Regions:
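PLP-dependent amino-acid enzyme catalytic core
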Residues: 1-456
Length: 456
């Protein structure tokens, strides 16, 4: 294979190309988003069958860094990196699990869940962060002055950044909206010794502040406006096809917050088809919480986007009113005739409890995706016989406090406005799904009296 080139170009089409050594990963001309552009002609000198064989062989290899689901596809991520640059915690190659009983409950016969919560820090964000932090290590080794790496976060990005920077021994800073994360999510950057800053604003406010801070003080920005994150995350699409025998599902359902994830998946599926690894691209369904659904509103209004103020939602990573990657996401969805759906808080709660009831440790964001899937099946857009993969973006253990509070009724999840106002809706409130422990005396007759009626 010929040498592989990779560079930055402006997503908006400004003339010029820039190396990946750029510290401020915004277009130098317009200040907008950049894309990572690969030498697809060089990549195409290897056939689709040869790429499949290479990726399959690497999946079984113990030679570092091939056990990483990202770096086993290194030519498609960042071919400039040397082995000594790569910072990996063993991300990727997470399970993809058939869920027939849950699928039947949702109205589809062929449902699969891609368990991104099995990544090192418990979410899909690790796939992008390994690529970004590895590039920072390369730049610092080459003499670039990068004092630290920073991000704004609603939880999972901060966990990934802090862990990968700790592995690389690079200082990290995270800006968090005070009181908007689960206890478990807040614990992660603290325990990785990231400098953690809680601000009295929402995610959008944190994003504006961290971008300004980075540009003024030689700090490298790690949010998904940095396209290196997208390149790592796009390997998830390759994993899905690879784990399904190099077949592409009919639908992929992905939760949407800052919208880097759907952008990455679309890029990965498109490149696989272009290089001949697969013969089609899936249809994409982006799922948003109704309290924070700017992309859904744009979809319902001919893709005309307007920034909103996100309301409170248990799907905290979606509490974003001005997603950084919205223009990229809209372009990707328009290209594949994608769909956007929104779920109310009650629908979210019902969905994640359904996932739990069928054996998943379901986080609220996956609950949003399951609720959106149900609504699109009921609308007739997703057909019962079609194969559907739902991206479970994070592990339910990150939300143990929320789940425990729901079941113990100490602090139930937010209720939708319709539920609060409608007595009939209150009767169907998902709090009826709670499963508190039974407190019983330590006597067999009392235990039998309580349990035997439940076994009939």
């Amino acid at each position: 294979m010929t040498a592989l080139r990779v560079l930055f170009r402006c997503f908006e089409g400004c003339p010029g190309e820039w190396p990946l050594s750029l510290i401020d990963t915004r277009c130098p001309r317009c200040g907008g988003l950049l894309d990572v552009v690969h030498d697809e002609e060089a990549l195409a000198t290897r056939s689709g069958a040869a790429w499949r064989a290479l990726f399959d062989a690497r999946r079984l290899s113990a030679q570092w860094p091939m056990p990483s689901g990202v770096w086993s596809k290194r030519e498609w991520v960042n071919p400039e990196l040397d082995d000594e640059d790569i910072i990996s915690l063993g991300e990727g190659f997470t399970p993809i699990v058939p869920m027939p009983t849950l699928g039947r409950a949702l109205g589809v016969a062929n449902l699969w869940i891609k368990q991104c919560g099995h990544n090192p820090t418990g979410s899909f964000k690790d796939l992008g962060m390994t690529g970004l932090v590895s590039q920072v290590v390369r730049l610092r080794r080459q003499g670039a002055h990068i004092a630290a790496v920073a991000c704004a976060s609603t939880g999972d990005t901060s966990a990934a950044l802090s862990a990968y920077c700790a592995r690389a021994q690079v200082p990290s800073i995270v800006f968090l909206p005070a009181g908007k994360l689960s206890d478990e999510q807040l614990t992660q950057p603290i325990c990785s010794y990231s400098q953690t800053v809680a601000l009295d604003t929402d995610f959008d406010g944190c994003m504006a502040l961290v971008a300004a801070f980075c540009s003024r003080h030689g700090v490298y920005l790690a949010n998904s406006m940095n396209p290196l994150r997208i390149e790592g995350q796009k390997t998830l699409s390759i994993e899905i096809a690879q784990q399904l025998g190099w077949q592409v599902p009919d639908w992929v359902v992905v939760p949407g917050g800052n919208l880097g994830h759907v952008t990455a998946l679309a890029r990965g599926f498109a490149l696989q088809k272009k290089l001949g690894l697969t013969d089609k691209e899936p249809k994409l369904l982006v799922a948003q919480a109704a309290q924070a659904a700017p992309l859904y509103r744009a979809y319902r209004h001919s893709w005309q986007f307007q920034q909103t103020v996100a309301g409170p939602t248990q799907a905290t990573a979606m509490a974003i009113g001005n997603p950084v990657n919205v223009r990229k996401a809209i372009a990707a969805l328009q290209r594949v005739d994608g769909v956007v759906e929104a779920a109310t808080e009650d629908e979210i709660t019902r969905a994640w409890t359904a996932g739990d009831r069928h054996g998943l440790a379901t986080d609220p964001h996956t609950g949003v995706a399951l609720a959106a899937l149900r609504k699109q099946v009921e609308a007739g857009r997703i057909l019962p016989h079609e194969q559907v993969v739902v991206i479970s973006t994070a592990h339910g253990l990150k939300f143990g406090t929320l789940k425990r509070a729901f079941h113990l009724m100490t602090d139930p999840p937010l209720a939708s406005a319709t539920t609060q106002a409608d007595p009939a809706a209150q009767a169907a409130n998902p709090t009826t799904l709670r499963n508190p422990p039974l407190r019983l005396p330590a006597h067999l007759p009392a235990i039998e009296d309580a349990l035997l009626p439940k076994l009939t």
